[in-house]
């Protein structure tokens, strides 16, 4: 986990402001017993080194590390992410919303929020294993080795994707009422850190795990000291 320059008081208020807030900083060297879904098959490698989650996905299809349950409704997810090394022709980082039916590729549903080397940011929804709808695209030049703060929101039929606090894409669709949530990597070696998930269905984890003895905040609120 990288340092975040805020006070303990700000940390506590930010985390306790929601009835359900899950924080993951990877400081324990593990990402737990989570499902990994590789869209289109192929391989991916997810591991934790030095308090940072690392994904290696060598093909131009997305690999997603999934949190939560399929009955999760409204929530937000945010994290810090950067692409360190492109591997495939198409590469991206992003977040995955309302993911369901991963046991059957022909019936999987999800809403991707992606930024990559295509020069645009967009939300792309898939229904029953097929492309269903895509948001208007917004121009965006993704820089390698630069940390970005990603945030995605699923609220009723509305989906929003933010990068560094700026709304980059939005989509309205009623066909994705609930589902799991995840971190998405395509065609690259990418780093991810400081995951925060909030929502009515999201279980709290211990606030004390979000703050080290030195008072460093382990979520993405506050000003990051970019490396």
Language model feature labels by segment:
Residues 6-16:
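Bacterial N-terminal signal peptides
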Residues 18-226:
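Extracellular glycan-recognition regions
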Residues 1-5:
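Positively charged n-region of N-terminal signal peptides that target proteins for export
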